[in-house]
Amino acid sequence: IDVQADLSARGARRSVAPTHKLTVVLADALAALSVSFAEVLILLVYMAFVLRIDFGNQVGYIVLTCLAGCVAGVSFGSLVGTFVRGSGSVKTAVLIGLNMTMSFLAGLMWAPIKDLVSRKVPPLSYVNPAALISDAFYSLYIFGSHPRFFINIGLLFMLSALMCTASFMKLRRTRYASV
């Protein structure tokens, strides 16, 4: 909301500021990523030391997966925030709906759907961040395969870059009749 001049006073100020839009978008994204990743790290510490969940020798890979997931989440939020017109409530509703759909298609709500999607619509498995994140964890703990893990992480970072680029291009081209 704060990047669109017609939706908030802060957005109006930002759109006329002499600061390059890419700088503003990157600063916002880094701030959101820092908070998101810190929350996930706190959760991992809680799981490891309070709940005593043993992550084995894969902790570095788990942290990398969490970082890639946070980057994808922030990028996806930026994409939706830039392209969806409406209030914060509308954007939140769209984000929740899309996240639930991606989670369902990744097999996180009904396990057989993951296999069905991978057989009937294979490309969907490669562009669904929820599927890539869950498959990264599966590849570490079920398959024990690092090449598959790194493919998932690479795809997550590529999707994130595409979403950030699309957000920036849309934001850069937006013009307002009056601010």
Question: Where do the protein language model's features map onto the residues?
Answer:
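Hydrophobic alpha-helical transmembrane segments
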Residues: 1, 47-49, 81
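Histidine kinase transmitter module recognition
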Residues: 2-3, 52, 86, 143
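Short juxtamembrane and helix-loop transition motifs at transmembrane-helix boundaries
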Residues: 20-29, 53-60, 83-85
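Interfacial helix-capping/hinge residues at the ends of transmembrane alpha-helices
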Residues: 8-11, 43, 77
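Regular secondary-structure segments
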Residues: 15, 42, 46-50, 134-142
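Transmembrane helix boundary and interhelical loop/hinge segments in multi-pass membrane proteins
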Residues: 1-17
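Membrane-spanning alpha-helical segments of multipass transporters and channels
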Residues: 57-179
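Selective transmembrane-helix segments that form parts of the transport pathway or gating/packing helices
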Residues: 20-47, 63, 67, 71, ...
